[in-house]
């Protein structure tokens, strides 16, 4: 345990007695920590207390954080939503007028580096979107973005993309019902806001992908490219009919679903179109840098090269693999295992290396009042846990 001492020097008389020795012991105060640590994660609590030697009588306490008064109790619960180092001060005085002071430095680290994010669009009429975080221990932090920044995400949040430790959150209606804007950019580890964009050109934007400083945003007209360095928004010609669904990024290319085709976008232009025999229901990057593509009729999972756009392998499924009315792919994958539900409550997985499909679970057996498959399912790429919305 670290101790932070301040010694008070007491003047000694020329004549020493037993009583004088007791009264002239050095007094000290330090800040104690219940956890014996001065490091916490955002929104966690550091339990501190004043520890005193050789002071008696009525005590008065004053706690400060970076010079601002925060408490007059003998204990203090330190918690902060923002990362960084904070100087915690403690001043103690007794009824004889003796004053002691000490300080310590507490470090607040990013909380959101390991876990899963759940984006909730919220009620369009009177709410905004919210972001929930579930850490690796299963502890959920609701409205995590608001707790950190004290501002609200945009109205009807639609999609989230993480790239280079930045999080991009897209909303459909932007600054409505108190929302801060159409697109929010935040640090992915701390959720601390970096920038907010609003734009009246876009018509109900639904999905985004990030390649370097360029953002590809799909709306009712097609796909636009937003250069974040200049804030210039440009329509990508040839993307009319882009589906309301997530895009995939491999290298410097973005892959966008059309009805029976996949648009390949590079440097703000469509450089290729990959055609398929049936309607697409999902696209995602594979564990080995290729693409998973799901088709509806016949139900199938196809592995596609992002370099020459040829089919590496294709498996026909014995159950349907539709995306429903949501804005997310029909499937989610970890390694070569693809999970899907056909927008229903029965969860399936297809092991691509073995070309085998099996039913994993009936969600209604776990959630009795489940009424609707709302938008998507996702698989934690580390733990393999499946999140079902």
Task: Identify what each model region corresponds to.
Residues 139-152, 192-199, 230-238, 268-275, ...:
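A short beta-strand motif characteristic of beta-propeller blades
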Residues 150-162, 201-212, 241-251, 277-289, ...:
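Repeated scaffold domains used in trafficking and secretory/extracellular systems
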Residues 89-90:
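Hydrophobic/tyrosine-rich beta-strand signature of extracellular beta-sandwich/beta-rich modules
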Residues 122-126, 173-178, 222-224, 261, ...:
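Short glycine/acidic-enriched loop and turn motifs that connect beta-strands
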